[in-house]
Structures are given as C-alpha cells and as structure tokens.
C-alpha cells in the first residue's frame, strides 16, 4: 500500500477475522478471510457530512476490501448523534458492508486514559445511557479495550474499603458489565450481542478490573 495515501483521517483499526490461510487479494473480495475495521467516535461523528464520508471512504475502499465496520458511538464523552449513526449505517449497507457498534468508555483518553468511576452514581447513569443508545442502533456492539477503571476518587476509596484494588475492581467491573451494559442493552434490543474485548496489553491490567 502506498504509504503516502492519507488514511489516518479515519484512524482505522483493522481486524483480520478468521485464520489467514491465503493472502492473495481478489478483485471483489478475499478468499480465505474477512476484514473488519473499527472507527473511533471522532471519525464517526464526522460522518454527519456525507461528502466527507464519501470521499474518505473512496480512499480506503480503493486499498482494502471491507466486509464489516464497527461504528463507535462514544469516546471521551463524545456521543455520536442518532441521525449521524443512521446515515452512516445506510451508507455502508448500500455498499454491502455489515455494520456493528462500538463503545470506548473513557472520560479523557489523553489524560492518562481517564476512565469512568463505576461507583459514582452520575458516571453509572452515563455508562448505562451509552449502552442503551448503542443498542438502539445496532444488533451487535463491541466494548473497546478501555472497559476498565483506574479511578481512585473518594467514592471509589470508600467503596473499596479493606479490599485490594484488584479484588474491588474485578467485582466492580463484573457488576458494571452485567448491570450497566448487558442488561440495559438487552432491554432496549433483546437481539443485541455484546462483545467485551478485555484489555490484554499487560498482566497488570487485572488490577484495573
């Protein structure tokens, strides 16, 4: 691929699904694998401009045959609007591309990956609303690696008590995944499938739940 082609505007993360047995490209598709891409909320939000979406996608689709695209609905407190999500879905469906949702539960990624505080009532409400918002638009969505917490607010310290941070956060994130994400999403859309992609960068991430 020509390194000069600017695809970083879309900031895509490419997942190769299935085992890659044959890397030979075909005119219309690939024989031995499918390709999915993940688009951050920042770029999904830009899809409100159909001309931006069309021109950007033309660059990408000339270089890569895409089967599925994950459209992120939230990152860093940016929630993509309903109309933008529906327009983006239609754009890709019209081109034969499957769509799914994605969520990154961060407050401010640039601030040392600032996460939600999952014992904070206001944060819990936001987490649930984001899950419901996403389930309304998609029958499948994936939680990005940032579904963890490093929060040490007064609320969290009090809730932790005498537990270790690891034990406390493991229980907290299990409860949050079940009661703030899965159950509310299923209530909005009984058919929805939620994929939790647990952080796998370092073994120490278990300390963040």
Which role does the model predict for each range below?
Residues 2-12:
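Bacterial N-terminal signal peptides that target proteins for export
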Residues 2, 20, 24-26:
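Position-driven detector of the extreme protein N-terminus
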Residues 27-209:
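Glycan-processing catalytic domains of CAZymes
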Residues 11-22:
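Bacterial N-terminal signal peptides
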């Amino acid at each position: 691929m020509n390194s000069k082609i600017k695809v970083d505007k879309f900031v895509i993360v490419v997942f190769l699904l299935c085992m890659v047995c044959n890397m030979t490209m075909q005119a219309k598709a690939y024989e031995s694998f499918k390709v999915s891409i993940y688009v951050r909320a920042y770029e999904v939000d830009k899809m409100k401009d159909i001309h931006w979406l069309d021109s950007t996608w033309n660059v990408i689709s000339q270089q890569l045959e895409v089967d599925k695209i994950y459209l992120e609905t939230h990152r860093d407190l940016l929630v993509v609007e309903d109309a933008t999500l529906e327009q983006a879905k239609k754009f890709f469906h019209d081109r034969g591309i499957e769509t799914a949702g994605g969520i990154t539960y961060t407050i401010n990624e640039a601030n040392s990956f600032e996460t939600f505080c999952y014992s904070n009532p206001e944060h819990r409400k936001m987490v649930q609303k984001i899950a419901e918002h996403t389930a309304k638009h998609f029958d499948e969505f994936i939680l990005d690696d940032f579904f963890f917490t490093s929060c040490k607010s007064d609320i969290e310290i009090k809730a932790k008590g005498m537990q270790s941070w690891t034990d406390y956060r493991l229980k907290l994130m299990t409860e949050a995944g079940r009661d703030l994400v899965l159950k509310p999403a299923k209530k909005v859309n009984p058919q929805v499938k939620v994929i939790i992609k647990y952080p796998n960068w370092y073994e120490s991430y278990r300390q963040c739940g």
